[in-house]
Amino acid sequence: MKKLQRTLALVLASIILCLAFTSCSNTGKSIMTKTYTKSATESDGLNLASSATYITQDGKTKKSFSLKGKHEEIKYITVDFGDSVDFNTVVFGEAGKKVTLFEIYGSNEQDANYQFLYQSDCIEGGHTCFLGDVKYRYLRVFVNQSSGNYNVNSFEAYYLKNEKAKDLRVNAYFIAEDIKEDADFSNLDALTDVIVFGTAKFDGQGNIKFYDNDSNEVDEQYYADKVNLLKSKIGDRKINIITDIAMPYGDDNLDIKSMMNEQNVDNLVANIVDFVNKYGFDGYDMDYEFPEDKEDWKRFNNFLRKLDKAMPDKIISLAIAPWDLRFDDDVIKAIDRVEVMLYDMFTAHGYHSIFSTTVNGVNKAIKGGFSPEQIDLGLPFYSRPTNRLGYWGNYNQFGGKIDRYTNLIYFNDFDHDGNPMTAPQYINSVQMVADKTAFAIDAGLGGMMIWHYSCDLPYDDELSLFKAITDTKTAKQK
């Protein structure tokens, strides 16, 4: 499995990314501003906050939004739109990164009958809160928990719909080993694309070999049976099937350098094309996340040019970490999709994949040359512990402990090496997934990417994350 094969690399990457992605940077804030200015214009919507007044906890009325408090001081502010108005989206900004729990309530009376609407944890540089269609005159915004003195300094409210919401890609990695007759295939109803990952693996010459979950080499029929079973379960659903042949990661990635060098690259490309055609795949995805130097990037760009020329009518997809991108301009045009991995990136609180790191990562991918339409926003359907150790827990293992809003799960278990593990687990809840999906639509992104398919609850469960994506797409449509 990808996560087990690459534990060390991910832990090291998390340390690096923690320094770069712990909050929504100024560039991240700029994409939030651009997104909601553009979305409001296209939806004939207005920032309802522009004409609102704000009532402080002690009854004073202000023209601007500001919610400040001391460490662990619970405070609220009331937003008065002046009349009962329709809206579905609230956007907050914070100066700093101290808020760890906030809530939104709505009412048509200033001081009575407030209904709970929303809860989440971090705001930092920016947080889109997707509420669904609601209609209220008053909102009351609470900060319930913080790790220090806080300052929530911006508030926007919109009613945003988009006819393109229905076209948002939903692309999930499906680990080949997990394709079994007794697996849950109900979440296929949410998907437009699947990427079959693993079992097939490159060697240092670009040849393809096959391995089971215990790393034993097996006959190709073992892989073929998995693919055929998946195709039978997909049936007549309109789902693209893309293959991802596992990379030969190792010390200094010497086998990757070898398979892309001038001696082997043509063999590599030919083997990919033959493999894609043999199984009738709709495209090819490469999970080469960490080219290390100028020569690595030169080889990678050269390979992608050759691959695009060899299979121009197939989807070319790349899993990327959104930093230090050095794709040549012509190569960027040849890439159909980038699966932007916006997870395993920790805040100072030890939370991975919060909303603002997602915004920052998307912005970095755009700054790296990709158009929004090429970008699939990466979602983790798994947990990471707040102590950042190498443990990945499937979302569906927390049954009975999860609800729509809570991202922080208190869960005692053993890590992958059998050691006791007591640190809280951070997940992306149904609401967090809805928020990120709404943002992807508002920002004009091409789609969502999920690592990985088998982590979710069944599609008919009210806490299914795939269902959260579908429901948000539906709610955002004009």
Spans of features found by a protein language model:
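Glycan-binding loop/region signatures in secreted carbohydrate-active enzymes
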Residues: Q374-F439, Y459, L465-K478
